[in-house]
Amino acid sequence: MNNSNGSAAPTVMVVEDFEDNRFMMRRLLEMSGYRVLEAVNGQEAIELAHRERPQLILMDLSLPQLDGLAATRRIRQYPALRDVPIVAVSAHDTADFHADALAAGCNDYVTKPIDFDQLEALLRRLLPKNSGQ
C-alpha cells in the first residue's frame, strides 16, 4: 500500500485479543493510510514483530498467554526492534499502569476507549519522519 504521495504506508501492528476492538482499530488505521498487522496475544506479537518489523506497535496490556508488558519486554530484547515505538493500550488509566508500561519499554500510553484523533497525533509524533505519513 502506498500513500497519495507515492511513499510506502507505515506499518502499524495492533495487538488486541478482542476481535471487535482489533477490527475497529484496523479500519480506522487503514482509512488513515496505514498498513496494519494484527496479533491476538503477546506471543504472537513477538513472533510477528520479529518477522515483519512494524514501524509502530499498539500493545494491549491485558492479553491471554503472555500479557502486553511481558511481550513488550521481550520485543525490546531484539536489537532490530529496540527503537520501534510501542504504545500501551489499556482500559486502566492509573499512574501505576502508566509507570508499569513505561518501565516495560513502552514509549507512550493510551486509554480505551481510544480517541482516534489523539491516537493519530501520537502516531504522527512517534513514527519516523521518513515513514510515509
Label the model's feature ranges.
Residues E52-L58, L63:
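Active-site beta3 strand of CheY-like receiver
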Residues G33-V40, L48, V110:
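Short hydrophobic/Thr-rich beta-strand motif most characteristic of the beta2 strand and flanking loop
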Residues F23-M31:
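Charged docking surfaces used in two-component/phosphorelay signaling
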Residues P64, R82, T94, P113:
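The feature encodes the CheY-like receiver
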Residues E16:
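Conserved acidic carboxylate
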Residues M1-M13, D117-Q133:
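Non-catalytic signal-transmission and effector/linker regions of two-component phosphorelay proteins
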